[in-house]
Amino acid sequence: MALEEKERIIIPDENGDEHLFEVLFTFDVDETEQSYIAVVPAEQAEEEEVEVYAFRFEEQENEDFTLFPIESDDEWQMVEEMLNTLAEEEEA
């Protein structure tokens, strides 16, 4: 059985330092036509408790994408529901 390789992305912080993250999942919301991504720092990916970061993103023409902070409570609630669903599926 082959191990599934996780997608990894580099996200610069506000100081321009680059950090490697492992993508947990992405999802689209049809009603708002927005896309979201949840990531964890690559060095924490195998730990039992990890800090999850979530962003809204827009894909660019050159296969890159731009990340935007999630600012509204409604958006956060939606992302948290997706994280909870994912956690429940992994426990099953």
UniProtKB/Swiss-Prot annotation:
This is UPF0473 protein OB2006. Belongs to the UPF0473 family. NCBIfam families: PRK13678.1-4, PRK13678.2-5. HAMAP family: UPF0473 (MF_01448). Pfam families: DUF1292. PANTHER family: UPF0473 PROTEIN CBO2561/CLC_2432, UPF0473 PROTEIN CBO2561_CLC_2432. The lineage of its organism: Bacteria, Bacillati, Bacillota, Bacilli, Bacillales. InterPro entries: UPF0473. It comes from Oceanobacillus iheyensis (strain DSM 14371 / CIP 107618 / JCM 11309 / KCTC 3954 / HTE831). Signal peptide: none annotated.
